[in-house]
């Protein structure tokens, strides 16, 4: 339904549409340039359930649209598209179906990864999403012996108990099956997380650290810098410093990471949640590219994944999501008393931790994150903040 409505709208203003079927978000970012399109559009719920479906738009360069252009599009929609001329007759756009997108994207990934994974046994969770067809072609072609889960999409089960937001099934499968490691994507495959052979999680921080170290050793870490967000673990930051790698920190959101990378000429960046951007090969976060590079690193290292996963100790971190609608999120942003309370909680940690409270841009939630060396202390801190939010914003 969404594809049909979107296609009809585009054709009604004279645009021709090439429909590529079900493909990962980063595939569209790549193919928009390869096919010389003016823009690329993805219908996706990202890592969320299917009822959160929306659209992501890429410019002809393969990069996401800047905020000001997205705001202009939203303004047109809010104004019932006033001033936009609707075409008639022969001027109406046409729709074309293309079946070569999948293979073109797989070929691009294969050439970008450029590795031999022979001898690796890997369990891969495709989240019942767009990565399923790609992963089943790509990783065996690279030489890995793979078992796949989450490869039975029915249009409704995407991200449901599987994928990067539900690692428990993958971790169990890896341990029970004796795999060398596990890889998990989200529904539209712009995120990648993993686990080692012991079933221990590998988040985006760990993956970025490992890939950045490898790039530095090969002289490919531009500016000796990785770009991350304020959510990155303090253990990660301190480890990178110890290895002579700078970290640039941005607001949460892969678009802000990418903006910093492009402005300053950096080659790697990403988020703890699994968005990893490798700018030498891609214009956006690409889960399958990230997985391929990580598996190549593992194969060439001669080590177990648990050894790689243990390169640094993470600081304990507590994350609590408070359900809040748009009005409640707005009220939180404007509450100066609450802001002062949160600042006071930060001071109580006395430099041994940090507090980050933010409004989610993709879900109806206020996220409370507290990090520090004392697990009991950060739990108490998070509880106090959540209780204050509930009382002042939610009236509970």
PLM regions and their residue ranges:
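N-terminal small/polar loop signature for handling phosphorylated ligands or for N-terminal nucleophile
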Residues: 1-52, 137-195
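Buried hydrophobic positions in well-ordered alpha/beta secondary-structure cores of metabolic enzymes
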Residues: 28, 41, 47, 109, ...
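An N-terminal, well-structured beta->alpha segment
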Residues: 1-13, 19, 38-39, 92-122, ...
């Amino acid at each position: 339904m969404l594809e049909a409505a979107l296609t009809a709208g585009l054709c009604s203003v004279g645009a021709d549409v090439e429909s590529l079927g079900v493909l990962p978000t980063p595939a569209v970012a790549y193919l928009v340039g390869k096919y010389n399109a003016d823009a690329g559009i993805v219908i996706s719920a990202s890592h969320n359930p299917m009822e959160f479906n929306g659209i992501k738009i890429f410019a002809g360069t393969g990069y996401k649209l800047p905020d000001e252009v997205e705001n202009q599009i939203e303004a047109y929609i809010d104004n019932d598209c006033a001033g936009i001329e609707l075409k008639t007759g022969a001027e109406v756009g046409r729709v074309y179906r293309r079946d070569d997108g999948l293979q073109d994207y797989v070929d691009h990934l294969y050439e970008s990864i450029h590795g031999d994974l022979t001898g690796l046994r890997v369990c891969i969770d495709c989240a019942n999403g767009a990565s399923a067809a790609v992963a089943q072609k790509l990783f065996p072609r690279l030489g890995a012996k793979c078992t796949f889960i989450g490869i039975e999409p029915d249009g409704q089960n995407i991200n449901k108990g599987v994928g990067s937001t539900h690692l428990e099934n993958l971790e169990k499968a890896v341990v029970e099956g004796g795999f060398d490691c596990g890889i998990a994507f989200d529904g539209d495959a712009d995120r990648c997380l993993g686990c080692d052979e012991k079933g221990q999680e590998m988040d985006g921080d760990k993956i970025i650290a490992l890939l950045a170290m490898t790039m530095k050793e090969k002289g490919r870490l531009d500016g000796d810098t990785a770009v991350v967000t304020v959510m990155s673990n303090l253990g990660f930051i301190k480890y990178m410093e110890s290895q002579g790698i700078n970290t640039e920190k941005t607001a949460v959101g892969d678009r802000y990471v990418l903006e910093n990378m492009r402005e300053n000429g950096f080659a790697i960046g990403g988020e703890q949640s699994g968005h990893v951007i490798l700018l030498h090969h891609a214009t956006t976060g690409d889960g399958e590219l990230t997985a391929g590079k990580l598996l190549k690193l593992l194969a060439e290292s001669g080590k177990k994944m648990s050894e790689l996963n243990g390169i640094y100790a993470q600081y304990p971190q507590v994350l609590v999501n408070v359900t809040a609608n748009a009005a409640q999120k707005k009220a939180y942003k404007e509450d100066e008393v609450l802001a002062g309370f949160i600042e006071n909680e930060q001071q109580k940690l006395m430099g041994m931790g940090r507090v980050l409270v933010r409004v989610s841009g993709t879900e109806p939630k206020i996220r409370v994150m507290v990090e520090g060396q004392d697990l009991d202390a950060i739990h108490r801190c998070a509880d106090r903040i959540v209780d204050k939010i509930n009382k002042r914003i939610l009236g509970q």
